[in-house]
């Protein structure tokens, strides 16, 4: 957790599939993750997926010009803790930052992580990936890239619609 297993896995009914990939165009990187269930999702899988989706939305709602980028991570963690996850970076919960800068490198500063005081400015690009991970069970991560404008964040890709339609 949070980036899969080093051992081969057999996909079975109820298995969570977590895809994390990206591409490079003219030297600029991208990063995207989607999670879905092979077969019928359990109520717990559905609840976690919906919680992560809301976490992604909270990150975007918090993104405003001059706001410290670390406050985006703080807002997502506050919501997750209210939902019973964590606290902080503890598992089960969100063990990594909410997102990272993206551009000429796939992971670059500034980071959407507690304590990063970098003020959010127009033109900055980030990933938004507030996953939730339950060791020994499953993890859900939804990740999309966005850029900051004077009027707020704008997505490069549409957010996942639902657990049944994550693309």
Model-predicted regions and their roles:
Residues 1-167:
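Active-site neighborhoods and metal-handling regions in enzymes and metal-associated proteins
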């Amino acid at each position: 957790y949070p980036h899969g297993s080093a051992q081969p896995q057999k996909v079975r009914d109820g298995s969570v599939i977590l895809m994390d990939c990206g591409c490079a165009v003219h030297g600029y990187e991208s990063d995207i993750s989607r999670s879905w269930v092979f077969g019928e999702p359990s109520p717990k899988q559905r609840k976690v997926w919906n919680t992560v989706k809301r976490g992604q939305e909270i990150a975007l709602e918090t993104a405003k010009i001059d706001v410290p980028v670390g406050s985006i991570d703080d807002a997502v963690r506050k919501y997750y803790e209210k939902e019973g996850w964590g606290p902080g970076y503890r598992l089960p919960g969100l063990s990594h930052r909410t997102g990272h800068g993206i551009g000429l490198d796939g992971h670059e500063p500034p980071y959407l992580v507690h304590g990063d005081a970098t003020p959010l400015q127009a033109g900055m690009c980030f990933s938004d990936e507030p996953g939730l991970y339950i060791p020994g069970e499953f993890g859900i991560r939804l990740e999309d890239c966005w850029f900051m404008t004077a009027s707020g964040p704008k997505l490069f890709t549409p957010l996942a619609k639902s657990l049944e339609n994550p693309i």
